[in-house]
Design a protein with these regions (language model features):
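Conserved ABC transporter NBD signature motif
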Residues: 57-67, 74
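Helix-to-loop junction immediately C-terminal to a conserved catalytic motif
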Residues: 49
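Conserved ABC ATPase signature
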Residues: 110, 135-139, 143
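Conserved ABC ATPase "signature" region
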Residues: 98, 113-131
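Conserved structural motif at the start of ABC-family nucleotide-binding domains
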Residues: 2, 16-20
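Conserved catalytic motifs of ABC-family nucleotide-binding domains
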Residues: 156
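The feature captures the beta-strand-to-loop junction immediately N-terminal to the Walker
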Residues: 34-36
Length: 161
């Protein structure tokens, strides 16, 4: 469960971009954050992901304060799908999906066959099996976004943002 209570954020000494934002999302629920450009939707999600620190309020994940959670546990339980295409250096699609397991693949341990089997199965489920070995640089924006969603889901997170 994700719970945001009276969240507020602003850059530096500037006025708060948003304040008093509260919501709760339970397991199995979906939440859409809507609003005009520049109102702070992405910034709020970046705060939830701990890329930015709130100026006020609290974020809890499964009842624990997010800012006090162990970093390894936090990243094990949560996956994030960015909204913009990132530089990917021509990785094959399947490798991009396997990178979602990076917390499980430590230095000295390369991805295993079962990691790739999971990635191929997920790509098939998303209708992307035919492009699994294609370079990410050749994908449309929509295809690439689906690859990023598959990468986020491969580790079975409790929360997908």
């Amino acid at each position: 469960m994700l719970k945001v209570t009276n969240a507020g954020f602003g850059y530096g000494n500037r006025p708060l971009l948003f304040s008093k934002v509260s919501f709760e999302v339970k397991a199995g629920e979906t939440l859409a954050i809507l609003g005009p450009n520049g109102i702070g939707k992405t910034t709020l999600l970046r705060c939830v992901m701990r890329f930015l620190a709130l100026k006020e309020g609290e974020i809890e994940i499964d009842g624990a304060g997010a800012k006090h959670m162990n970093q390894k546990r936090f990243w094990r339980d949560i996956s994030y799908v960015p909204q913009a295409k990132q530089l990917v250096f021509g990785y094959p699609v399947v490798d991009m999906v396997v990178m979602g397991l990076s917390q499980n693949i430590s230095i000295g341990r390369t991805p295993r066959r079962e990691d790739y089997d999971r990635a191929y199965a997920l790509l098939e489920k998303f209708g992307l099996g035919s492009i699994a070995n294609q370079s990410c640089n050749t994908l449309s924006g929509g295809q690439f976004q689906m690859v990023l969603i598959a990468r986020a889901l491969i580790k079975g997170p409790g929360l997908l943002i």
